[in-house]
């Protein structure tokens, strides 16, 4: 598995699977939930859950006789919002009211942990824009971020505006292991690359 996770963006897990069934069909699997269970040094498993958004056959597994290899990609339910283009008007609603109206029809779990109250927007327009970009734009304007939590069988979107709502990770220290100086890899979570980068940004906001 190769995966990426971000704050205020979509996670993506590219997964290689094996099965004795040589005739698994994408139409039966795409859109279905998938959960990965990862052993950790703490002894308790870590779960990663998503929805299968693409599925393909690779071929016979070279290492396991009578097994066939498949590949799939797992993404959060919020990925569905990237697949539409919509135009609509929201009247007398706050950013959280709008988010609730956009997300609720999908029927997937999300929770709001925002600590601030937000202004009522008299008139807010989504015009020829997918709903993911629309919500991201509103969240960025208001200083709201989001992330996903994973459990065995599901994942949940969490919307927040305060770091005080974040849960501490089980271990406060993550070791650094450079592949350039030490061969092999430890059987624990670790950082292998740390990069510092400067960028040109605007310094003023004028209205």
Label each PLM-derived region with a short phrase:
Residues 1-207:
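Amphipathic alpha-helical and helix-coil boundary elements used as assembly
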């Amino acid at each position: 598995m190769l995966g990426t996770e971000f704050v205020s963006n979509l996670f993506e897990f590219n997964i290689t699977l094996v099965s004795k069934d040589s005739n698994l069909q994408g139409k039966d699997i795409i859109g279905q939930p998938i959960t990965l269970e990862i052993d950790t040094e703490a002894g308790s498993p870590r779960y990663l859950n998503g929805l299968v958004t693409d599925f393909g056959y690779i071929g016979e597994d070279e290492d396991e006789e009578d097994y066939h290899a498949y590949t799939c990609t797992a993404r959060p339910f919020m990925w569905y919002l990237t697949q539409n283009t919509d135009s609509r008007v929201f009247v007398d609603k706050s950013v959280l009211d709008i988010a609730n109206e956009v997300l609720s029809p999908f029927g997937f779990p999300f929770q709001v942990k925002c600590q601030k109250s937000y202004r009522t927007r008299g008139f807010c327009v989504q015009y020829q824009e997918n709903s993911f970009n629309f919500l991201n734009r509103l969240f960025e304007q208001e200083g709201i971020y989001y992330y996903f939590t994973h459990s065995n069988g599901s994942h949940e979107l969490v919307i927040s505006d305060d770091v005080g709502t974040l849960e501490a990770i089980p271990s406060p220290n993550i070791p650094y292991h450079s592949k350039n100086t030490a061969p092999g890899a430890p059987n624990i979570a670790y950082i292998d690359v740390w990069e510092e980068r400067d960028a040109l940004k605007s310094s003023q906001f004028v209205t």
